[in-house]
């Protein structure tokens, strides 16, 4: 197959500045290439990156992109400009185009032969009705499937595919639980919708018994955070705790080292309409962290309460008490931590890049064969 991965306007590939979607497709593209497919990955230009290069069997093409603006309206305009350039750089022999860009599925109307595979990486906001050219809406969780169904007629549900996100790394080392440290970790954007103030209230309620809090992620608005003032106020909220804000860490080996040392991973997101999958908890589980997550639907695809993690009710009148009780349970019981962590490690198999890549390839082949058969039938009628 000739596969094109078309990313958005604001993050470079390789994902030096982060971006969960860019990170995922960068790894998946390499797996597709290992399986013998020709892969072209289109992304924004970035200083130090050539306009074209080959990385691990994947042909990378880069077009002029943009820095994320604060204005959502301006963001959509810049994405449109970028997407038009990016679509024009797609090779003519392409069999399938995978894209998470807002405008690309619309501009791909001009390409009548390639399958258009829309990766609905964020909760849709009304745009799906404009994607008449899309052969598939790929959801990464049951929560996203439900959101897609809210935007398209029931007669179009057959276009929905559910394929989970894979782990963005391979060849993980064995976990030695004896050398893990008393660290409660959060990785993600330092944003008000992520429930970090709730986490602060929760840990202030209990005796942490020497456990440390580590928060990894950007707070700058340009990188999806809530800003410097928010971060400074958040530091004050953790008044009774030993807390460290590291800022963003994009180096995979350094991030994995942090995961490997941590014992508990807390992701108390309050984003009812924002979270689609929860890659950070999945990554943490693969390194033997016990996840504690809020009761959002997206997490339930891979976290089962008291089986491989803990889920607390963030919608109750006392969510801080609920979260505090979950943290305290794990601090108090080493056996509970280890039992849950051993089960959490199974995501290394269920969500490996190799396994998920093969799921995608099977899906791609079905869609490509279906489109070819449909085009052949249309051409047959034209000749009559």
Where are these regions (language model features)?
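A short, well-ordered alpha-helix in the C-terminal region of glycosyltransferases
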Residues: 329, 336-350, 362
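N-terminal strand-loop element at the rim of the active site
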Residues: 9-13, 31-73, 221, 295
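Acidic donor-binding loop of glycosyltransferase active sites
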Residues: 260-276, 289
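A short, active-site helix/loop in glycosyltransferases that binds the activated sugar's phosphate group
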Residues: 126-128, 135-159, 167-172
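Conserved donor-binding/catalytic core segment of Leloir-type glycosyltransferases
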Residues: 138, 171, 176-194, 200-205, ...
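Nucleotide-activated donor-binding/catalytic signature segment of Leloir-type glycosyltransferases, i.e.
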Residues: 227-253
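Short hydrophobic beta-strand element within catalytic cores of glycosyltransferases
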Residues: 286, 290-293
């Amino acid at each position: 197959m000739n596969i094109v991965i078309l990313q958005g306007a604001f993050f470079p590939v390789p994902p030096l500045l982060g971006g969960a979607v860019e990170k995922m497709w960068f790894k998946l593209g390499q797996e597709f290439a290992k399986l013998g497919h020709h892969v072209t990955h289109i992304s924004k230009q970035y200083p130090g990156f050539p306009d074209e290069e080959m990385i691990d069997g994947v042909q990378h093409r880069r077009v002029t992109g943009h820095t994320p603006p604060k204005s959502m309206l301006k963001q959509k305009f810049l994405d449109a400009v970028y997407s038009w350039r990016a679509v024009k750089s797609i090779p003519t022999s392409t069999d399938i185009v995978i894209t998470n860009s807002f405008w690309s599925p619309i501009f791909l109307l001009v390409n009548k032969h390639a399958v258009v595979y829309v990766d609905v990486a964020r909760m849709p906001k009304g745009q799906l009705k404009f994607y008449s050219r899309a052969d598939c809406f790929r959801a990464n969780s049951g929560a996203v499937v439900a959101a897609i169904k809210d935007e398209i007629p029931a007669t179009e549900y057959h276009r929905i595919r559910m394929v989970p996100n894979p782990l963005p790394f391979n060849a993980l080392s064995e976990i030695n639980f004896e050398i893990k440290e008393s660290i409660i970790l959060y990785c993600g954007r330092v944003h008000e919708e992520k429930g970090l103030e709730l986490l602060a209230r929760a840990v202030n309620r209990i005796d942490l018994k020497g456990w440390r809090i580590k928060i990894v992620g950007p707070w700058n608005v340009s990188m999806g955070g809530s800003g410097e003032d928010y971060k400074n106020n958040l530091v004050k909220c953790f008044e009774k705790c030993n807390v460290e804000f590291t800022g963003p860490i994009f180096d995979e080996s350094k991030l994995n080292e942090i995961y490997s040392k941590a014992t508990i991973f807390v992701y108390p997101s309050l984003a009812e309409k924002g979270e689609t999958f929860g890659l950070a908890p999945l990554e943490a589980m693969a390194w033997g962290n016990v996840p504690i997550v809020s009761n959002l639907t997206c997490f339930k695809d891979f976290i089962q309460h008291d089986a491989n993690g803990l889920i607390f009710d963030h919608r109750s009148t006392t969510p801080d008490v609920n979260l505090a009780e979950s943290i305290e349970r794990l601090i108090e019981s080493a056996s509970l931590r280890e039992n849950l962590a051993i089960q959490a490690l199974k995501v290394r198999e269920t969500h490996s890049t190799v396994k998920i890549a093969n799921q995608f390839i099977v899906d791609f082949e079905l869609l490509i064969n279906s489109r070819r058969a449909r085009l052949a039938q249309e051409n047959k009628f034209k000749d009559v």
